[in-house]
Amino acid sequence: MARCPACASPRTVFHEELGTLSIAHMDCDAFYASVEKRDDPSLRDLPVIIGGGKRGVVTTACYIARMSGAKSAMPMFKALKLCPDAVVIKPNFAKYKEESRRIHEKLDRLTPLIQPLSLDEAWIDLTGTERLHGATPAQMLARLQAEIERDIGLTVSVGLAPNKFLAKIASELDKPRGFSAIGAAEAQSFLANKPVNILPGVGPATVASLAEIGLRTVGDIAAADLKLLANRLGSGGMRLHRLAHGQDSRIVDPDQARKTISAETTFNDDLHKREDLEDELWPLCEKVAKQARQEGVAGRVATLKLRTPDFKIHTRRRTLAVPTQTARTLFQVARELLSAEPRGLAYRLIGAGLTEFVDADTAGADMFADEERRALKSETAIDALRGKFGAAAVVTGRALKGR
């Protein structure tokens, strides 16, 4: 890429494939913090952290706070050590959902092929829309950026590429207010010197595993023997090899944005003891978490469902600071929700679920806090053992307690 031949702007570049690229990734810039700053101008030049409690984690840090080292999923006590002057605001997800709806309303006018990843990001397929809009995808997206900032008061960054993987990377190259493109011709050379954790799904454990066999850059993976990768990472190794060559066959699928994953069970006899209810709850959490891992998503909201003998349904929800795809976290939250219910009530059904998903594969393992990461590693290993030797191959202590 080179500077724009028309104006030579340092932030404007010319790209030979710009007129033909049609897969985009759009990401709001520090979304939650930006909404709060827009609504309270006195916060504009201050470091803002969205999160709750010293024992919680950072949900979002504004760019000023990030300059001090604060970042998403970091424990709050650590973030406040790095940025002691930060203004801490508890997340207001109802407000953020409304702003997300306004943004997606504008996206819907461009194309029906939109795959939301979370409240603040989405993949967009603009293939074949040139005649409809009288403009290339790049032109439409540039207009969309300006319109969102003008009408909603928030900024977004856009990545344009031939596939979802490259579009996601491109959107992160020039934040905030960024617009970057990665073409097919340059993809492999662009990726070659990047660290392996730029690839989706590569967290600290995979980085260490790859380093043990001398693979530290994306170029190393691209040049690696397929058998070596398969022996080390199984089918995941083959996937990383394709990505290292800039290849990604996934389509932008609006239907992939599943609304909820849940499991429930009805008792033969009504249960009222808290311990009995928890014993029934654990395998449901395992089932939900396993399904989330299989689909490559993590839920931001945990739900508990209860039905009383008179068939009244009680649903409780809690928004998590960090998305989860582990039974450990889902069970912990569902149990806390259950403990808030009046003791002594009888129930004929209990259920657990996750909703408001983010793409865990795209975000990578580093999106999770340390405890969540350890639980994820453990539960993924259990998945593999059960898949090979049967469901009874590994029985957890909680499951044994319920027997």
Curated annotation (Swiss-Prot):
CDD domains: PolY_Pol_IV_kappa (cd03586). The keyword NADP does not apply. Mg(2+) binds at residues 27, 120. Its EC number is 2.7.7.7. GO terms for cellular component: cytosol. The active site is at 121. It is found in: Cytoplasm. Belongs to the DNA polymerase type-Y family. Poorly processive, error-prone DNA polymerase involved in untargeted mutagenesis. Copies undamaged DNA at stalled replication forks, which arise in vivo from mismatched or misaligned primer ends. These misaligned primers can be extended by PolIV. Exhibits no 3'-5' exonuclease (proofreading) activity. May be involved in translesional synthesis, in conjunction with the beta clamp from PolIII. PANTHER family: DNA POLYMERASE KAPPA (PTHR11076:SF33), DNA REPAIR POLYMERASE UMUC / TRANSFERASE FAMILY MEMBER (PTHR11076). This is DNA polymerase IV. It comes from Caulobacter vibrioides (strain ATCC 19089 / CIP 103742 / CB 15) (Caulobacter crescentus). The lineage of its organism: Bacteria, Pseudomonadati, Pseudomonadota, Alphaproteobacteria, Caulobacterales. The gene is dinB.
